[in-house]
Amino acid sequence: MNNPWKNLPETQPYILPSDYELIDFENRNLSHDTIIQHHVLPEPYIGDPNAPIILLNLNPGYADEDVAFYNQKHVRILWKKNIHHSSMDYPFWFLDPSLDVEIGGARWWQTKLKEPIKTAGLQKVANRVCCIEWFPYHSRKFARLNKIIDSQNYGFHLVQKAISQKAIVIVMRSEKLWFESIQELRSYKHIYRLNSPQNVAISRKNCPTGFPLIETILMS
């Protein structure tokens, strides 16, 4: 499947042409908290989708500080390389040490991946972990749209490819939606859940069945 994100407009609104009509319609009825924030760059996935560890999340959140974060030239360069699946030293680009870890997604992800980073270091985690979002656009709170938008199918394709490559899959949030969208996940042997979908830290305590395997992969 071709990568549709190469067609994302370079100016606002940051919505794929194939998604625009439905998102524009839905946004008219969404609340302040659930409206889709198309003035910041979307995050359909973070990292190399061929990584051996795949995290399944719901959608990228939104805070007011994200505007300044994504407007940084260096951030936009890293974001574009990621979205195009270009070669990077830190494919999970929120772990790139050149970023300010006190702002935006860099702070959030370094907190959630604290134990894997402590185990293997930033670069190994950045090269062996990928997160795929069920819904690619930012919002303060998630609200399911009435239909699947076109770009979601590419994310589903990446997960199906990861399954075929026998990656381990960690469900961070919204198992029900992921299982509805990708039937293969229901019977997949290498899938693990977190004890707390509210605190989605990837840790031994929060993912007791999967974390030992994560450690093994990171240290190999």
Where are the language model's segments positioned?
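Low-complexity, serine/threonine/proline-enriched polar segments
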Residues: V75-C130
